Amino acid sequence: MRSRLVLAAGLFSLLGSAVAGALTVSPAPSLSKLPTTATVVRAVTAAEGKTKVPTGSITPPLTSTGLYWTSVNPGLSNPSKPGCVINDAATTIPAVIGTSCAYGDPTSTRVVALVGDSNANAWIPALDTWGYVNNVKVVAVVHAACAPWERPWLPKDRPIWGEITERKCAVWRRSMMSKVTALSPSLVIPVGITATDKSLKMPTTAELTTALTAMVTYFTPSKVALLEPVPQFTLASSVLACVSGHRTSLDQCEVRRSAVTSNALNQVFRQVATSKKAAVIPTLNLFCGPTRCPLFVTLNAQNYLVYEDGYHISHQYAQIIGAALPLASHVK
């Protein structure tokens, strides 16, 4: 082990700008300073009682929450991988995802696959860090607005975001599932959220349960790990808008832990995991204290903004908590 990641607009459009050189990227954290799970949990708990925007440096800056990231792996010069991270209506995935879409330790024979929508993309910095530290290859195949499970409740040709439709997501999803299965990973981590556009039909609990069960069954339950869904806010812009108006009363902006645990998707995740004997990775404590889920967390004397927007965690917070992910026991 060496010494010590409207619906996807912000995350994916900023990614494109970063590749074009329009954004400055944040430096990679020092491997020797990556916090443990216990350290992150203590920091989150300590942040819960703070009501003011922290003084000093904040990463990502409030003026550039989509700031791109630099991998802890010095051999990974560009974390953006065409076809592996799709932000438009394209559906073509690289032929050899084990090479083209590799993060973490690309030379390892142990493989973890990360699949899903823009929320899966937000987890890439965390899984990249975790994989590099633990000598595991992480293969990421993600598509904006395309959940890793089927969504028969959505109209096939109605735009979800931009020109992305469920019909196009279905084409991408079939290709993703086939290529990931052929890769024979030790673990598959599917990440997604239900529709955030209220004009789109929301699934019933039964529909969501059926969809997640089918996905877990396809990948083989014993090889699936579901990350606990992270806190979400009402609108994509709601986090920053609230912080702007409540710089000394951040508790007015925070999500309560009870709201996250009672979230329909979170409950269905647990029900499906229990019935199919899949794993649920306890990540909620990396975001929420006993009562609330803070917007800012301080680690190694650096203030981190936890969220890029109302639906996505920031690249920088995802990266700094990467080594704290409790995944090791699930990867053979």
Where are these predicted regions, by residue range?
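Extracellular/periplasmic envelope-modification machinery, especially enzymes
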Residues: 2-332
